[in-house]
A protein has these predicted regions:
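Conserved N-terminal segment of class I S-adenosyl-L-methionine
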Residues: 2-122
């Protein structure tokens, strides 16, 4: 995909994008992983309205795996699942987990607390 984009996008645009990307990442230089992801969560760094975990956690992007996981659970007799990092549990909440004990964990304490409040009955 990247190679295809490089063929069509002018080099100066790619250079500008890279410069912008590096400047955004520079704010995390030298920080602990927990601090980086806490900042990303608190500032909603990914800018996705559907999931604070980013574009890769939307229902559209995860539809295929969400549809197939229940079959995997059943086929392999899976009784428990540990999901690290679980992020905001946005798409995983929609996966049928009949008979599977789900445990999610994340490095962002505020996110874990929020998930525990939102999903305490699940």
């Amino acid at each position: 995909m990247k190679e295809t984009i490089r063929k069509f996008v002018p080099k100066f645009i790619l250079a500008l994008h890279w410069k912008y990307f590096k400047s955004r990442l520079s704010q995390f230089k030298g920080k602990e992983t927990e601090d980086v992801f806490t900042t990303i969560y608190q500032k909603q760094y990914w800018g996705n309205k559907e999931s604070v975990s980013g574009d890769g956690s939307t229902k559209e992007e995860t539809q295929n795996i969400a549809n197939h996981l229940p079959h995997v659970f059943k086929e392999y007799g899976i009784q428990s699942m540990l999901d690290i990092p679980c992020g905001d549990y946005y798409w995983m909440q929609h996966v049928t987990k009949d008979g599977v004990a789900y445990t999610g964990g994340d490095i962002v304490a505020d996110l874990v607390e929020s998930n525990n409040r939102k999903f305490e009955k699940q």
